[in-house]
Amino acid sequence: NLEDYSIFWQVLKRDTAENLMHILFVASKLDDIDNYLDIVRQSGLNPVVVDVRCFATRNALALREDLTKSDAPVAIVEFGAFENYILILYKDSPFISDIYLSEKDRNTLMDQDSTDEQIKGISNRFSMQVSQMISSYTAKYKTGSINSLLISSSMPNLERTIGNFNEALPNVDVEVFDTLL
């Protein structure tokens, strides 16, 4: 029974000529996870189970019927101090790619006293990578255009960056995506 497992998968490569797909498939039996938790508890420790952020984001997106019912791909960007990636979902197939953000830029984004000019420069560099990844994805997988970009972040300066993302990605509707709602 599939409900007994926590499952994630991603198509890594499609070979239409050979009618083959390379797939990354990760699954954990929920009972096994519970057994390991019991062992840790018996040793006197209090374990905490955390859903990997990109999995949690994907699970939160499943609750947004306005986006998941569409035939268009949906892009979610994690813009944070520790993780930066784009997750593109199309017909239930996830595609995940890392986005580079330097340590200096991370520190600037975390600093409430950073200037609008600093934030804009970082946002523009980040947006350029997002734009390139979206273009590469739509060209490689022959999908329609991506019109909606959801940004998930724990950064204190997120509201200051949304306008910059909208400016840098004029053909995409950018909105904050709160995975906790």
Enumerate the predicted regions with their spans.
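Hydrophobic/aromatic-enriched cytosolic interaction surfaces used to assemble or bind macromolecules
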Residues: N1-L181
